[in-house]
């Protein structure tokens, strides 16, 4: 199999990268009716598999789970989750031949084996669904020409997909049809019905492409969503402790600081996040973020280049074939870091203190979000896609760190995201560790910025620069569809 994206000519590549249209709510007037009366079989019962299935069943669809025979015989976690929630569970041979839509929600590294196992069992004219297009785009999986291939990609972890649905809402979602596999022209109708069944139509749906989803998703998770948070956590903790801060306080400031800071980002973008700072601190955070962008732009561009070319995917798949040696080594090294092993702080940190004492962290968030967005857009990805894969998902990832530090983040995200995170963080830490971190001033981290005087003209120009960045323009529109999403709890 060959990387699908690399088989396209330049015009086709640019066309696929640039596919992105925000769909009107009137386009979902029929909601999930196109799939009602049809049999949907989900392969895989992890976080996305279970929670999408629960939502789809509650939307009136006929849902069953196909698991490997050994998972059923040994009553593994996937079997327990499906049966405990009252779903029909059977082997591939039992359920796949009956399915009108087979939804593959297994991890990326299992996709080829799963698809090669289920494809011969699928009936003529059935549909195959994904929530991430890596198998199609990067692996280049070939699907039978009578099978329709669609994607519905919620832009949240599976648990959030369920919680927002239970509240009568949903999470922003990307949908797509594989242009090589839409023999009956029904792919978009299937994808729309599936998205509506998960509740995604209530929060906003982008009609995208498999290519645009994969390339933007990989870029976001490697850089700002995971890699920047990991690098920022390790660098900030070590800096605080080296300057005499209590390790327990330093750990809590960072562990819960990302969540607190990005909650403001979620509600009002970079503008609101920066507005939570005093005027002198805002000017300092802006200056730091510009400095960071200058230093880190080549690293962001390298990751985007390697994603576009397929270099990243080929390297990761080589590690799959080598029993994940690199991934497991990097995971072990992360677990041994000082931040991960620091004592817990019993005291309370007020919400505003996270901003006042975390000016560097605010600057890192701003720089990372803007760089990821700018790099994606300059590579042909449309602004709406770039927004969802940079700013939108960041509070959700930060929330995982608040639960159990970097360990929890790396457990919750996919192995693909985790591998990319380590690649980025392992390059970013040495890039910033010496010259940049050594140049920090008192008030950048661990203590509030001293002084109250500001230059009005400078403050005016900085405010205008923040508010006029393209991610703020598109973000204001997209956040208008998400006002009903719940607030992430912020720890004290």
Swiss-Prot record:
Q: Where along the chain is Mg(2+) 2 bound?
A: 217, 389, 393
GO CC terms, sorted: cytosol
Q: Which residues bind substrate?
A: 414
Catalytic residue positions? 132
What the entry lists under InterPro entries is as follows: 6-PGluconate_DH-like_C_sf (IPR008927), 6PGD_dom2 (IPR013328), KARI (IPR013023), KARI_C (IPR000506), KARI_N (IPR013116), NAD(P)-bd_dom_sf (IPR036291)
EC numbers, comma separated? 1.1.1.86
Q: What is its pathway?
A: Amino-acid biosynthesis; L-isoleucine biosynthesis; L-isoleucine from 2-oxobutanoate: step 2/4; Amino-acid biosynthesis; L-valine biosynthesis; L-valine from pyruvate: step 2/4
* Name of the top EC class for this enzyme: oxidoreductase
Full protein name: Ketol-acid reductoisomerase (NADP(+))
- The species this protein belongs to is Pectobacterium carotovorum subsp. carotovorum (strain PC1)
Its taxonomic path starts at:
Bacteria, Pseudomonadati, Pseudomonadota, Gammaproteobacteria, Enterobacterales
As recorded in Swiss-Prot or TrEMBL, the protein's gene is named ilvC
């Amino acid at each position: 199999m060959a990387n699908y994206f690399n088989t396209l000519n330049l015009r086709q590549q640019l066309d696929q990268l640039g596919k992105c249209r925000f769909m009107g709510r009137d386009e979902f007037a029929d909601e999930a009716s196109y799939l009602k009366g049809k049999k949907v079989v989900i392969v895989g019962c992890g976080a996305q598999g279970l929670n999408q299935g629960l939502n789809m069943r509650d939307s009136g669809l006929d849902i069953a789970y196909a698991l490997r025979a050994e998972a059923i015989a040994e009553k593994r976690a996937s079997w327990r989750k499906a049966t405990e929630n009252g779903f029909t569970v059977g082997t591939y041979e039992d359920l796949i031949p009956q399915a009108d839509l087979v939804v593959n929600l297994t991890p990326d590294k299992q996709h080829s084996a799963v698809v090669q196992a289920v494809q011969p069992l699928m009936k003529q004219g059935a549909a195959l669904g994904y929530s991430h297009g890596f198998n199609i785009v990067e692996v280049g999986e070939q699907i039978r020409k009578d099978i329709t291939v669609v994607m519905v990609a919620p832009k949240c972890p599976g648990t959030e997909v369920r919680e927002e649905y239970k509240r009568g809402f949903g999470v922003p979602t990307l949908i797509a049809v594989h242009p090589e596999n839409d023999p009956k022209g029904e792919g978009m109708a299937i994808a729309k019905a599936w998205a509506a069944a998960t509740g995604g139509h209530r929060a906003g749906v982008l009609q995208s492409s498999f290519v645009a989803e994969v390339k933007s998703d990989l870029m976001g998770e490697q850089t700002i969503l995971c890699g920047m948070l990991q690098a920022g956590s390790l660098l900030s903790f070590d800096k605080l402790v080296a300057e005499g801060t209590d390790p327990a306080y330093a750990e809590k400031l960072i562990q819960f600081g990302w969540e607190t800071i990005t909650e403001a980002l979620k509600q009002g973008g970079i503008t609101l996040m920066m507005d939570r700072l005093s005027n002198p601190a805002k000017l300092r955070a802006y200056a730091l973020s510009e400095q960071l962008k200058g230093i880190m732009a080549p690293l962001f561009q390298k990751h985007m280049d390697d994603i576009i070319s397929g270099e990243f995917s080929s390297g990761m798949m080589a590690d799959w074939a080598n029993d994940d040696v690199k991934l497991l080594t990097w995971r072990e090294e992360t677990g041994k870091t000082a931040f991960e092993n620091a004592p817990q702080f019993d005291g309370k940190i007020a919400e505003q203190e996270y901003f006042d004492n975390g000016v560097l962290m605010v600057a890192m968030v701003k720089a990372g979000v803007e760089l990821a967005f700018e790099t994606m857009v300059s590579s042909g990805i449309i602004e709406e896609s770039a927004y969802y894969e940079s700013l939108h998902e960041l509070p959700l990832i930060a929330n995982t760190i608040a639960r159990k530090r970097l360990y929890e983040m790396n457990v919750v995200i996919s192995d693909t995201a985790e591998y990319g995170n380590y690649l980025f963080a392992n390059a970013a830490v040495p890039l910033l560790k010496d010259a940049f971190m050594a140049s920090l001033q008192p008030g950048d981290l661990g203590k509030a910025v001293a002084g109250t005087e500001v230059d009005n003209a400078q403050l005016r120009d900085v405010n205008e620069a923040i508010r006029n960045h393209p991610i703020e323009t598109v973000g204001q529109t997209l956040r208008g569809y998400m006002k009903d999403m719940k607030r992430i709890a912020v720890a004290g």
